[in-house]
A protein has these predicted regions:
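Polytopic transmembrane helical bundles with strong interfacial aromatic enrichment
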Residues: 1-210
Length: 210
């Protein structure tokens, strides 16, 4: 799952930073992916086991793929919002302090914000489709579309946050505030991807981590 998301992030990043002047963004995207792959091979590693009966459905690859793609695009959007906030703090030509050498090669705040917004535009419908497909699968498997399972709940909260980000981003003078909402959405996404699986018991706790 994590490896698939890493691959999707790599593809999205490659499309976004293919221009020569965007290559300085690569380290900001590669570093978290290296950490994710390390955790995948250590903390989250487990022996392969037969798929539980509830997951033996053609809905599995459809639901997981759509949610994973939406989450991956959203995470890249969040990284660009982080870089945007750094650029707002240290505009082009006014870099200062110990972070100046790191921020100086980055594109302008306007360009970074534009990419974060465009990626979130894709995140919202893809993630929404994944949630809807999961609800359809839940009705077929357990006889109800929604059960407020922890993962379902936080997926819905994440989707609402991305909708709030897009709404705030469309409001004049709210670019910085919108970027912070995008970071909250990214944090909620990461919390849902890792903490929920590791600690909280629920219908999505099939990985054996909790």
């Amino acid at each position: 799952y994590i490896l698939f998301m890493t691959a999707v992030i790599m593809v999205v990043a490659a499309v976004v930073v293919q221009r020569k002047n965007w290559h300085t963004v690569w380290p900001w995207l590669l570093f978290p992916m290296v950490i994710a792959m390390f955790l995948n091979s250590t903390v989250f590693h487990m022996q392969a086991a037969p798929v539980v009966p509830a997951l033996q459905s053609y809905w599995l690859p459809i639901h997981v793929t759509s949610v994973s793609v939406g989450a991956s695009v959203g995470l890249v959007s969040g990284v660009f919002s982080i870089l945007f906030l750094l650029r707002v703090w240290q505009p082009v030509g006014e870099e200062h302090g110990f972070l100046a050498p790191v921020v100086r090669p980055l594109p302008s705040a306007e360009k970074l914000d534009r990419i974060a917004y465009r990626l979130a535009v894709y995140t919202l419908p893809i993630l929404g489709i994944g949630i809807i497909l999961g609800a359809i699968w839940a009705e077929a498997a357990w006889g109800r579309f929604w059960g407020w399972d922890p993962k379902e709940t936080f997926s819905f909260i994440t989707w609402i946050l991305y909708a709030a980000y897009l709404h705030a981003r469309a409001t004049v003078g709210w670019k910085v505030g919108a970027a912070w909402i995008n970071l909250v959405a990214m944090g909620t996404m990461i919390f849902n991807l890792f903490f929920i699986n590791m600690v909280v018991s629920g219908l999505h706790s099939y990985a054996g981590l909790n």
